[in-house]
UniProtKB/Swiss-Prot annotation:
Record lineage: Bacteria, Pseudomonadati, Pseudomonadota, Betaproteobacteria, Burkholderiales
Cofactor note: Binds 1 zinc ion per subunit.
Main location: cytoplasm
GO molecular function: ATP binding; metal ion binding; methionine-tRNA ligase activity; tRNA binding
Protein name per the record: Methionine--tRNA ligase
Residues that, per the record, bind ATP: K344
Organism for this UniProt entry: Bordetella pertussis (strain Tohama I / ATCC BAA-589 / NCTC 13251)
Amino acid sequence: MSRTLFVTTALPYANGSFHIGHIMEYIQADIWVRSMRMAGHTVHFVGADDAHGAPIMLKAEKEGITPQALVARYAAERPRYLDGFHIRFDHWHSTDTPENVALSQEIYRALKSEGLIETRSIEQFYDPVKGMFLADRYIKGECPRCHAKDQYGDSCEVCGAVYAPTELINPYSALTGAAPVLKSSDHFFFKLSDPRCVEFLQQWTTGANRQGVKHLQAEVQAKTREWLVGDDGEAKLGDWDISRDAPYFGIEIPDAPGKYFYVWLDAPVGYLASLKSYCAAKGLDFDALLDPAGPTEQVHFIGKDIIYFHALFWPAMLKFAGRKTPDQLNVHGFITVSGEKMSKSRGTGISPLRYLEIGMDAEWLRYYMAAKLNARVEDMDFNPEDFVARVNSDLVGKYVNIASRAAAFITRHFDGELAYDGDTDALAAEFAQQAESIRAAFEAREYNRAVREIMAHADRINQAFDAAQPWVMAKGIGAADAATRARLQDICSRALAGFKALSVMLAPVLPALASRVARELFGANADFAWGDAQQLPQRVAPFKHLMQRVDPKLLDDLFEPPAAEASAPAALPGGEALADTITIDDFAKIDLRIARIVNCEEVEGSTKLLRLTLDVGEGRHRNVFSGIKSAYQPQDLVGKLTVLVANLAPRKMKFGVSEGMVLAASHADEKAEPGIYVLEPWPGAQPGMRVR
């Protein structure tokens, strides 16, 4: 029976770029969403930037820009990461939007009408140097529970305790280091200690959704019980301060001038705001979709560091605002490197953008993460040697190897026609059973189990193929009898049918590769669905290279270099000092344009030059000579985009006239650091566009 699901990931804070932890969570959710869609379910998968709060306000202030400009800068980066790792959200939004303002204020008013909002005068820390009330994250001190030092003002990263900033021991301002002073201020509290909230949360945290799946994993349920019930068996939930004083970048509380919602109130509402924006764009009924009595399942993927907000505050807010409560909270751990916490200072930090920029295949990482992730709240360890071994052995050595070997025989001897000797019902039934087992593992988020089973199937296919030795039969196939030909065709057809079934099973993990297999190799006009595993293919196209092996040397470039010692002299960028400062007017004199390399050829008599024919959108072609012969083969440059100094005076050379200069980078000491790198714009740029 088809289901409707509303799926989210935790909102990234919009004061920085995505880190590898974000990408892990998005890949985990994306695999789940793709698998559910392959099963025929309707999934609305949305995300958003968490765009409010003091950190954004203060960072923008430091940079001399508005908070909105800061948020927009990071929002503009998001597609590069998401597209790069084949993460396909239906919609990406922001909490700094009219939808989120309206929904946050509606929920607040509903809670207030239920008698769950209370105004209290509190003493709040104030930084006398900065001249502002301090948000929780800008107060540090000793945890009142476990006495760990340098903990934030709202929660302890060591023991997980949640507390009021005034409970910290020896607090200090994280902005100025000054000892904060206490000032009185009226604040608004969500009465989480109300017996109605306590009773609901005790039921919800131990309950299950209509599929029979628990709302919370066992480890998460145990943790919430610690927060819900004291040693004496009595409820111990504290009320939640949901307000902050101006100056603050956020959503104003209705009828309370100078008061704003704490970011953790409006941030999760951003899930709903993103869906509402998506529904408006697609003509869907948002209210009907999230009707508390309706069939839609609400599923959140989050990290283990934000359980408290999602397992207690969020469900209670929704429940008593008359809205749908979450059906499932999927919590994951952190990423470690070779068993240790990632650290830039130790050179074990992984930048997702660096991963893409050095040419590593996004689907290598998707596969590796799938092979390590499960439904428990466990950290995922990235081990470089294990990464290389798994990708090269599993994906290339086992999976891709099946198609590369079997398709060659079918193409060469049978013109791409597949044929099976005998009854194929058992084979189709076997694939269907295997696919259902894998589908169930993905739905249960036991990705590592799914990957193990898939590779076990690949092993069996390879073993059967090797045992049959089709290469021996193929040697004399031209003079072979019909039975031998049929036997060879059957062996290869069954191997390719198995490869197709494996591709269906891997499609949630390797969406780009599986799409190529479906469309290019087997001639399908759509991507795989789970039911395609049991449909035996009848034709195969000539095999094309599917996946490159991992070069272990790439891993040397992947990790962010360790921070330099403070005493070490600063290295010159690119081996040379920066040029003297110029004005914007000086720069404006240079007309840089996007150019397409229409043709490229060697220059007879020159050991350094290549002759480039460039289209700069002028209606004619330009001739440019460039000293890049040592770094590029002419055929590799044809069709590429590059950057041209378009208003450089033509230069008459021995070999002709050069009408501009193509930009390329190199180190000042070319002997010590050889290499020339022609600038290439991102896809989407067009010839003639000016570089500003």
